[in-house]
């Protein structure tokens, strides 16, 4: 997920478990600030997920773009992170709190807050609630979320993801 402002996060689901990485381009832990990945962020990523750390999709011109990293193997009882000495004076030094906020708070209200900030347009909360409840899409709901689209415009996308439609 890229926000268009230089920040991103990725989640890799693999047979061994799940690998999550985030990159906050304004973080004091940015590899562009520190001339490389901040110590501890990826140092203890297990072998099962090393290919994710080294994946070119998660780098920019050879620089691994990561400020936050966690993983969970299928055998782990909880999520794991590296041992990191975070920089002082920063409330969210790696950006994890805000990078992953929609993964933690999946409420319609949280999404509307994100969407209004990101797209800089009003977003209809009732329509977002409709979608989050997986109720069948209607023309009214689609138009409330995007006046330039109709339900017919989205038919192929809706069918492709198996979302219910009227």
Regions found by a protein language model. Give the residues of each.
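Compact, glycine/acidic-enriched structural inserts
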Residues: 23-81, 85
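Extended aliphatic helical segments
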Residues: 12, 18-20, 33, 37, ...
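Amphipathic, interaction-prone secondary-structure segments
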Residues: 1-18, 23
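A eukaryote-biased signal for long
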Residues: 76-166
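Sparse, context-dependent recognition of short Cys/His-centered cofactor- or disulfide-binding micro-motifs
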Residues: 3, 55, 139
